[in-house]
Design a protein with these regions (language model features):
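A charge-rich, low-complexity, intrinsically flexible signal that marks solvent-exposed coils, linkers
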Residues: 1-120
Length: 120
């Protein structure tokens, strides 16, 4: 399962995350902001990856940095606790999923980021 996700095109997965948030009344910009915050990419670099032939796994492997607050991003995604995932790459991917879930539940990107920045 992991390798299949890692090999998927970044654009396909990322656009699905955006669609999930937009279906619930959220905005694509919120997804861009939380992705940028988590991975260290500038928003413009995240958007540029949509037009490049980059895999989802490579997007995360090549992230400029991960914020220290990411360890505070815990909980379940697809029935699995993020903090119990052994594969560090999959952990980072699932952390973004968790942030996107908050956005899909009606939180703004500012509310989501403030929640985790309190753990500095």
């Amino acid at each position: 399962m992991s390798q299949k996700l890692y090999n998927m095109k970044f654009a396909a997965v990322y656009l699905a995350l955006i669609a999930k948030v937009e279906r619930k009344g959220g905005k694509a910009e919120s997804v861009h902001q939380v992705t940028s915050w988590l991975t260290g990419y500038e928003v413009s670099d995240v958007l540029a990856c949509l037009d490049r032939d980059v895999t989802y796994g490579d997007f995360f492997r090549q992230a400029p940095y991960y914020v220290p607050e990411l360890i505070a991003i815990t909980g379940k995604i697809c029935g699995v606790r993020i903090e119990e995932i052994d594969d560090p790459l999959m952990q980072e991917i699932r952390r973004l999923d968790k942030l996107v879930d908050w956005l899909a539940k009606g939180k703004t990107s500012q509310q989501v980021l403030e929640k985790y920045e309190k753990h500095k």
